[in-house]
Amino acid sequence: LAVLEKMRHIERLKQPSVIMLTAFGQEDVTKKAVDLGASYFILKPFDMENLPSHIRQVSGKANTMIKRPLPSFRSATTVDGKPKNLDASITSIIHEIGVPAHIKGYMYLREAISMVYNDIELLGSITKVLYPDIAKKYNTTASRVERAIR
């Protein structure tokens, strides 16, 4: 937070995009970081494989690994029918329904949506499987996950 405060006072034409990675999931800390200019907030532990897509999302740049543009007749899905940028779609939907990114349940909700997208059967066992799986990933309890999402 101290770095964000100092960056805020540096006179530049444009403030850089900041991705904040932290183990602290307290709502007040997250809100302060967002207020100070953090563009994206990642709570530890997180999936390292998703970091490049988060960076591209924050920077507003497309995937540089794609060498040629996709033809316009192709849809935005892969061969197995899943969106190419699931995380961006989830973020967009969550923002559309008005869930602020600084609340603790935001990361749990993102994870839950992603897990259900990959395995629709989880909808039949939300409290028995989904919440405990999310709790394991974030090193917390299923009841805390449920409370934060609600």
Curated annotation (Swiss-Prot):
Transmembrane segments: none annotated. Its cofactor is Ca(2+). Disulfide bonds: none annotated. Phosphorylated by KinA and KinB. One of its GO terms (biological process) is sporulation resulting in formation of a cellular spore. Residues 132-150 bind DNA. Its main location: cytoplasm. GO terms for cellular component: cytoplasm. Keywords: Activator, Calcium, Cytoplasm, DNA-binding, Phosphoprotein, Repressor, Sporulation, Transcription, Transcription regulation, Two-component regulatory system. SUPFAM superfamilies: C-terminal effector domain of the bipartite response regulators, CheY-like. One of its GO terms (molecular function) is DNA binding. It is found in: Cytoplasm. May play the central regulatory role in sporulation. It may be an element of the effector pathway responsible for the activation of sporulation genes in response to nutritional stress. Spo0A may act in concert with Spo0H (a sigma factor) to control the expression of some genes that are critical to the sporulation process. Repressor of abrB, activator of the spoIIa operon. Binds the DNA sequence 5'-TGNCGAA-3' (0A box). This is Stage 0 sporulation protein A. The lineage of its organism: Bacteria, Bacillati, Bacillota, Bacilli, Bacillales. The gene is spo0A.
